[in-house]
A protein has these predicted regions:
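Short, flexible, solvent-exposed loop/turn segments with mixed acidic/basic and small polar residues
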Residues: 39, 270-277
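Glycine/serine-rich anion-binding loops at beta->alpha junctions
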Residues: 83-108, 129-137, 274-278
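Gly/Ser/Thr-rich beta-alpha loop segments that engage phosphate groups in nucleotides
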Residues: 18, 30, 93, 97, ...
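ATP-binding N-lobe of GHMP and related small-molecule kinases
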Residues: 1-94, 104-115, 312-315, 320-322
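N-terminal pre-core extensions flanking Radical SAM catalytic domains
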Residues: 276-288
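A structural signal for isolated positions on well-ordered beta-strands in alpha/beta enzyme cores
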Residues: 79-81, 284, 308
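ATP-dependent small-molecule kinase catalytic core of the GHMP/sugar-kinase superfamily
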Residues: 2-6, 16, 22-26, 115-272, ...
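Short, basic and Ser/Thr-rich N-terminal targeting/leader segments
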Residues: 9-11, 32-34, 76, 128-130, ...
Length: 322
């Protein structure tokens, strides 16, 4: 094929894992923003360009994916351009969405359609612990995965996929970073740092059972029946319970005093569906209508943080050919 391939995908809010050992499992929701956009087109030789901050990390990520997709002595003959990427290390699953978009863009630009999904996932090299963002890349929606106790495949199966009620919205609160990119009172957790933390933790079979019950008996039915308050209460409790699995390595159910204090402030103000997405520092709260979410954004934006209104995605990534 010839011409430009353009992949657009969103982000994911992770409500928490079921356990700290395989098959892990968990749930979350895909959102429309922050958006990631990757383009690729045939070229005489492989190259990657970016128009977005963080170009070194993005360039290295793209080249690693190209190496997995290339032959022993050459990379795919495509030009990859990262047009837009969600901010990294905020708990929004940006690495998974970017990696999958890069891999799919390279495959489509070099080989044409259709793309073998297993090859795409292998090239992106994601889903080691959580498969929410990987499944959600293709489907959108609320995702629950890894609910079986004996799964041994590399990527957990998709157990539940639901559309969120159309009026519901979430607001993501992200602390503003200093000039070094750090967030006060919050440790960035990824890569080898993340692995080291998991290595310190022991499986928690009883807690897994409790969290699985909340997920299947409370969160899923509340989404299906559009019961907003029941959904919010269950998500808050599930998120805290999942966070307590990591208390030994993050100082409590949430990662750092800043996140802990913000969640307490939100709950004391009476908000619903409040929690930390993944390792944070992104914090979410859910709202029954767009208007209530917008009012919250106006009230809670301040010099220390940004408030972003997001809509649940009802479909997976989009692919365009020019």
């Amino acid at each position: 094929m010839s011409g430009l391939v353009r992949i657009s995908t969103g982000a994911r809010l992770h409500f928490g894992l079921l356990d700290v050992a395989a098959p892990f499992g968990g749930c979350g929701v895909m959102t429309d923003r922050p958006e990631t956009i990757v383009e690729a087109k045939p070229a005489a030789a492989y190259r990657c360009a970016t128009t977005h901050a963080g170009s070194t990390d993005h360039w290295q990520r793209a080249e690693a994916i190209a190496q997995r997709l290339g032959s022993q002595d050459s990379l795919p003959k495509v030009e990859v351009r990262i047009v837009q990427a969600a901010p990294s290390h905020n708990g929004l699953g940006s690495g998974t969405q970017l990696s999958l978009a890069i891999a799919e863009a390279i495959l489509l630009a070099s080989n044409g359609s259709p793309v073998d999904r297993e090859r795409l996932i292998a090239a992106a090299d994601r889903g080691l612990r959580s498969a929410v963002g990987t499944h959600g890349y293709f489907t959108g929606g609320f995702i629950a995965e890894g609910l079986g106790d004996d799964e041994n495949q590399k990527l957990n199966r998709l157990d539940e996929r639901l559309d969120m009620p159309s009026p519901w919205r979430a607001v993501v609160l992200l602390p503003k970073r200093d000039k070094t990119g750090a967030v006060e009172d919050s440790e960035t957790v990824s890569g080898s740092v993340e692995q080291a933390k998991f290595d310190q933790l022991a499986p928690a079979a009883q807690r897994r059972g409790e969290l699985k019950r909340v997920l299947l008996d409370e969160i899923v039915p509340a989404i299906r029946t559009h019961q907003f308050e029941a959904f919010g209460e269950a998500v808050t409790r599930y998120n805290r319970g999942g966070g307590e699995l990591f208390a030994a390595v993050q100082g409590g159910p949430y990662n750092g005093t800043g996140t802990t204090d913000l969640i307490a402030e939100l709950l004391n103000a009476g908000h619903h569906g409040v929690g930390q997405s993944s390792w944070g520092p992104g914090v979410f709260a859910w709202f029954p209508t767009p208007k209530s979410a917008w009012c919250f954004c106006d009230a809670w934006n301040d010099p220390a943080r940004n408030a972003y209104l997001v809509s649940p995605k009802r479909s997976g990534r989009t692919v365009q050919f020019d």
